[in-house]
Design a protein with these regions (language model features):
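Short, small-residue-biased leader/transition segments that mark boundaries at the very start
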Residues: 1-5
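C-terminal regulatory/interaction module of P-loop NTP-utilizing enzymes
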Residues: 7-180
Length: 180
């Protein structure tokens, strides 16, 4: 989250990452419809939603089945988690994103920050081998990192617009990959 906030008379500051897991009834799983109605009212406030970077559509992730289980040699999950933990502290990926992403003038700062953080996360997961901006295939970065990050943030904006008219018909800024 990494933000300063005020809630119900409490001032706070956060630099932690948070993941909310939950089930939304199948009939409500429509990003273009209001999905948050069955959640606690705290999660139906635009101020909190604005601090959530993106929404992962769980219904697009295949259900676990026997065909997805591995046999034989595999990557140890504890080792993999250790790698991810180390990558979390590696700021070089964010520096790469800063160098290759172009932000339009007057773009909303919170949207821009959310998209950049999500794109950085995708970069770490999908292209952990990159060490500088010259190692990045710009088209792959756009297709696999930046575009999905913007889609994840767009769902948040759509949900905000269904709660408060201030956010209605507002889209995320169109971040682009710099050509050079």
């Amino acid at each position: 989250l990494g933000d300063v906030y005020k809630r119900q008379g409490y001032n706070g500051e956060s630099d932690a990452g948070v993941v909310f897991l939950g089930n939304i009834k199948e009939e409500n799983m429509d990003e273009y419809g209001y999905m948050l109605g069955e959640l606690p009212t705290l999660f139906q406030e635009t101020a909190l939603l604005d601090r959530i970077h993106g929404f992962v559509k769980g219904w697009d992730i295949p259900r676990m089945n026997d065909g997805l289980k591995l046999t034989g040699w595999a990557l140890n999950s504890e080792y993999f988690c250790s790698i991810l933990h180390e990558l979390r502290n590696d700021m070089s990926y964010r520096a790469i994103v800063e160098k290759i992403v172009e932000v339009p003038k007057h773009a909303d700062t919170r949207d821009t920050e959310a998209i950049k953080r999500l794109a950085t996360a995708y970069l770490k997961l999908l292209f952990p081998n990159v060490r500088n901006e010259f190692d990045v295939d710009k088209m792959e970065f756009r297709d696999y990192c930046l575009t999905p990050a913007m889609k994840m943030r767009r769902i948040i904006k759509l949900q905000q617009g269904m709660i408060d008219s201030e956010y209605k018909n507002k889209d995320v800024p169109c971040l682009m990959v710099r050509e050079k």
